[in-house]
């Protein structure tokens, strides 16, 4: 855990707009960035649990193919990459 001095320095850097916690982008303080990072991590884990490992991997594969001008599905089609969207369904 960071000491009080380190926390204060990190908080000052965060207030200047710097991301000091991985995944804490957008937080205006050290504590806010910690909370954002924790929530984003938990959200991703929940989504993985809902979709299952295979569905989560397929969704990541599709998202990784997206570009500024084309969504991942179109790009995958052009490249001949097979994405099984049936695995995107949440488990009940």
UniProtKB/Swiss-Prot annotation:
Query: PROSITE patterns, alphabetically?
Result: SMALL_HYDR_PLANT_SEED
Composition skew (Basic and acidic residues), residue ranges: 1-18, 37-51
Q: Which family does it belong to?
A: Belongs to the small hydrophilic plant seed protein family.
Listed under GO biological process in this entry are: acquisition of desiccation tolerance in seed; response to abscisic acid; seed development
User: Pfam family example for this protein?
Assistant: LEA_5
Q: What induces it?
A: By abscisic acid (ABA).
The record's listing under InterPro entries reads: LEA_5, Sm_Hydphi_plant_seed_CS, Small_hydrophilic_seed_prot
Tissue expression summary: Present only in nearly dry and dry seeds.
Segments spanning the bilayer are none
This chain's protein is named Em-like protein GEA6
Q: Which GO terms describe its cellular component?
A: cytosol
- Provide the residue span(s) of the region labelled Disordered: 1-92
Entry superkingdom? Eukaryota
Task: State the protein's purpose.
Answer: It is thought to provide protection for the cytoplasm during the desiccation stage of embryo development.
């Amino acid at each position: 855990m960071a000491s009080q001095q380190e926390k204060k320095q990190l908080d000052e850097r965060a207030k200047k707009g710097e991301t000091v916690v991985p995944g804490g982008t957008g937080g205006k303080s050290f504590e806010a960035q910690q909370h954002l990072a924790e929530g984003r991590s938990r959200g991703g884990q929940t989504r993985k649990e809902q979709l299952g490992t295979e569905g989560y991997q397929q969704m990541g594969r599709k998202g990784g193919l997206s570009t500024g001008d084309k969504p991942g599905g179109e790009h995958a089609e052009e490249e001949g990459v097979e994405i099984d969207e049936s695995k995107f369904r949440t488990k009940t």
